Amino acid sequence: MSMGPAAGEGCGLCGADGGGCCSRHRHDDDGFPFVFPPSACQGIGAPAPPVHEFQFFGNDGGGDDGESVAWLFDDYPPPSPVAAAAGMHHRQPPYDGVVAPPSLFRRNTGAGGLTFDVSLGERPDLDAGLGLGGGGGRHAEAAASATIMSYCGSTFTDAASSMPKEMVAAMADDGESLNPNTVVGAMVEREAKLMRYKEKRKKRCYEKQIRYASRKAYAEMRPRVRGRFAKEPDQEAVAPPSTYVDPSRLELGQWFR
């Protein structure tokens, strides 16, 4: 037969009167022992248990308060001596210009988090694998392999030598239009045409001119009123010639005798 808590005692969890565990928390310790430890429902006079701090994502509660919350921020904890001796370091992801909010999963150092260990050993020589050489010799070899040739008065560098020799020869044969002498001749001809156009433009006169001397003489003879040509007055009508013929002058008598 179980006996209830003594009078004046409080519940170990909620502080209700009765001591020990009240009727609401008496059977909770059976299903959730990690939430309600046995010390919470112990007998009379048991002190109230301290507040429990639950660690998520595999973080243990060891260490001071600063270490317990360091995984919530963007600062990685220093590597352990064993990992440092083995050459394993925590490497931050490269910055791509996008500021991401701090993630609770990124700063977990336990077994259940998303921690990446990257070996920062000797970097493989990719240049040697690509046949480009390494160190200062790479630039020397590239400079030695460069091909510099003259093309129509200008120079260009074919360092990669990706253009076939046949194509280069064809371009050199078809480059007569880019001959410096041809270009200079075209420029001189253009300048001559421009000078002729300017001289012809200077001689232009947009005022009224009389091109023929006969027109000029006729214009001087015509009367003017205030500088303008005036209409000439009507002349008297000339009498038409008489059609009467004197028969004596025609000597018609000798024909009709």
From Swiss-Prot:
The modification Phosphoserine is found at S68. Residues 190-232 form the CCT domain. It holds the Pfam family CCT. It is found in: Nucleus. The keyword tRNA-binding does not apply. A motif (Nuclear localization signal) lies at residues 198-204. Residues 226-245 are annotated as: Disordered. One of its GO terms (cellular component) is nucleus. GO terms for molecular function: DNA binding. Keywords: DNA-binding, Flowering, Nucleus, Phosphoprotein, Transcription, Transcription regulation. This is Transcription factor GHD7. It comes from Oryza sativa subsp. japonica (Rice).
